[in-house]
């Protein structure tokens, strides 16, 4: 009885995996792989490679020790913290921890 139940569950899961279709909204992003099933394509899209964390140039870099990086950098004390601001290169903006 249990073997029959397990067989029917496995058969239904296999049937459902064959019926899985790519969603139309993501069909352009997924592309077409000739040997891969649609479920494998979705899984490969979700399990992508490592995400690069880029330092935004608009925000401040938070550091314990701040220093001037070029001759145009200047230091300002605001709200009890020291900030380094730069007119020529906004990547030089720093904030004290």
From Swiss-Prot:
As for subcellular location, the record says: Mitochondrion
Alphabetically sorted, this entry's keywords are:
Mitochondrion, Ribonucleoprotein, Ribosomal protein, Transit peptide
**Superkingdom of the organism of origin:** Eukaryota
The family database entries (InterPro entries) matched by this protein are listed as: Mitoribosomal_bL36m, Ribosomal_bL36, Ribosomal_bL36_sp
Molecular function, one GO term: structural constituent of ribosome
> Which GO biological process categories is it annotated with?
translation
Q: Where is the signal peptide?
A: none
Write down a Pfam family by its short name. Answer: Ribosomal_L36
Q: Which GO terms describe its cellular component?
A: mitochondrial large ribosomal subunit
Tell me the subunit arrangement.
Component of the mitochondrial ribosome large subunit (39S) which comprises a 16S rRNA and about 50 distinct proteins.
Similarity-based family? Belongs to the bacterial ribosomal protein bL36 family.
Q: What is this protein called?
A: Large ribosomal subunit protein bL36m
Species of origin: Rattus norvegicus (Rat)
Q: What gene, per UniProt, encodes this protein?
A: Mrpl36
């Amino acid at each position: 009885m249990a073997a029959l139940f397990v067989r029917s569950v496995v058969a239904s899961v296999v049937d459902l995996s064959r019926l899985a279709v790519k969603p139309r909204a993501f069909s352009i992003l997924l592309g077409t792989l000739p040997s891969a099933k649609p479920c494998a394509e979705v899984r490969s899209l979700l399990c992508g490679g490592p995400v690069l964390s880029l330092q935004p140039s608009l925000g401040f870099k938070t550091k314990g020790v701040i220093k001037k990086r070029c001759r145009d950098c200047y230091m300002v004390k605001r709200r009890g913290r020291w900030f380094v601001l730069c007119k020529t290169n906004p990547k030089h903006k720093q904030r004290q921890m």
